[in-house]
């Protein structure tokens, strides 16, 4: 009998991608996050689809339609809680996935890395427009503050902001188009993820040592399908614990009040996963400077392959770079904390120092550490 898995045009693609794919024998649990991100995306699309069936993108009814979903729709509360907390899980996996890439030098697969950065930006855009949809106080004011940053662009800024708003302020037109964007972007993310995988399979996976693993490969199935299934169980466990026991712990209490353009909340802040970038934005007193720093904080990932100075790919055997990497991690956690604090001392100065250290670590200290480690590894006789 002909093996359909290896001959059928469609099954053949799936087979080469997930079944007979040769994978390095030593990849650790840090390589689980790619598949977890795929699952997160599927969860978000499915729950989002069911939410879209009951949601209305009108300023007068958006807030009450979300309340209606939670109160009157069968399991609507569960669908909404899974969708809202699923976004948090998505970003948690994303940050760990990017961190893994930096630690093990995966950014040297330039095409895969660049598509990954575009994916990160697209997911951030999707999450931002999605946060506006419930039309609560923080949704409205978050949208107002962040879209207003466009007006910092010289000459065309104000026109651009009004073009995005569809008027002279965030209003009905803005909400309608944000809903349209929030619906279409996940499908663009799916397409980008396929391209991401396509480029990854051109080179094969990296591994913890950073050494070419061609001499020791194993089939993806059953070894890594089982390993991914374990990660998936942990993901579901954490997501269900969040969604069922503490669904609002990562949200903002201001979003329990309908949007009111006449009443500004005392402290405007985005969701937790944007706080590090928000802290960098706020650390610069100049509006345009802040916007540029905000963009640079993400786009800096694109130049990482060119900042790699070490002779070894992975940080596994590079203790100085490892130390700097964990300082960077601690620094990002500090920035996340600062982003959620009011604009007053000592938070202002801590935010400015942490922002400066963020760029200093990536642009100067880590490349220097690579050169230093090269020097230390040279034979001295």
Curated annotation (Swiss-Prot):
UniProt GO cellular component terms: mitochondrial inner membrane; respiratory chain complex III
PROSITE patterns: CYTB_CTER (PS51003), CYTB_NTER (PS51002)
Coiled coil stretches, renumbered: none
Principal location listed in the UniProt entry: mitochondrion
Classification via InterPro entries: Cyt_b/b6_C, Cyt_b/b6_C_sf, Cyt_b/b6_N, Cytb/b6-like_sf, Cytochrome_b, Cytochrome_b_C_euk/bac, Cytochrome_b_N_euk/bac, Di-haem_cyt_TM
PANTHER family: CYTOCHROME B
Name of this protein: Cytochrome b
Organism: Antechinus leo (Cinnamon antechinus)
Gene field: MT-CYB
